[in-house]
Structure formats: structure tokens, C-alpha cells
Amino acid sequence: MPAAFAASGRLAVRQGDRSDIAKLRWTRTRDSDLWVISSPLGNEVARLESGANGATLTRAGAAAESADSFQALTEKLLGVALDPGAIAGWLHGNAPASAPGEWKVSIDESQRAGSVDLAKRITATRGGVVVKLVVDEYRALEE
């Protein structure tokens, strides 16, 4: 799995009566993650950034919010804590065997991007939460 990559696609999160659909641009390096989340029409809604000093959520027209973890801010934004390290693993074909209370991950479609095999469509479920990721573009980055 490349240590650094850039990907873009669509993210959907459904939990109970709440459903969020967004465009996602994701840049991952060894030390950080950046998610730029946009509306389906392309308007930037939020930026989630993480690094050695914690994570920051910046929403359009609002003051930046900080937390110790990326997961805490995805929970604030999307209603569910998402671990970018786990999702990077899923993206690169590492769908873990599900244990009680963990995500049940299905790689619904795969693709090849250069020399990298990766998931094109991922569905992850846990309890009443469904997360879907569709990857439209991907490239490994040099560090």
C-alpha cells in the first residue's frame, strides 16, 4: 500500500433518518490526512485535516474546530467516527474479517490504478450505519 496518495470520489453516510452524500477529495501522506468535502454540486462544505498535533475541521463560513483525532471530527461532521487509516486499508483491498462491534466491509468493485490494485466501490456497515465510498480518481504520491 502506498504511504501517500491522492484520491477523489463520492462518500455516502446513512444512519437512521440521517443521510449525507458528498464529493470527497482525499490526500494522505505518512503523517497526515486531508479530506475536502463538497456538496454534490461541487461547493466546498468542509475540510478535515489531521497531523501530529491533532485534527482540525473547517466548515464554510464557520470558525475552525480542533480535536485530538480525525475520528472525533468526522463524528461531528457526519455523525459517525471514521478512521482514515482503516479506510485507506479498505481502499487498498484490506477488508478485515468483521468482529462484533467492528465494521463489516465489502469491496463491491475493484480497479487497477497504475501499479496499485484498489477498491473502486466500498460498503462498510456497523450497527445501523452504512458508509459507501466510490473512488473515481486515484494516484500514488511520492514522499
Name these PLM-found stretches:
Residues T27, G51-N53, D68-T74, S110-R112, ...:
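A short, sequence-level motif marking secondary-structure junctions
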Residues D17, L41, A60-A62, P100-E102, ...:
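Glycine-centered tight beta-turn/hairpin loop motif at sheet-sheet or coil-to-beta transitions
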Residues H92-E143:
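Gly/Pro-enriched, hydrophobic low-complexity segments
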Residues S32-D83:
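An acidic-aromatic
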Residues A6-S8, S19, K23, T27, ...:
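Beta-strand-dominated lipid-handling architectures at cellular/organellar boundaries
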Residues M1-D17:
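A short, Trp-centered hydrophobic/proline-enriched beta-strand micro-motif
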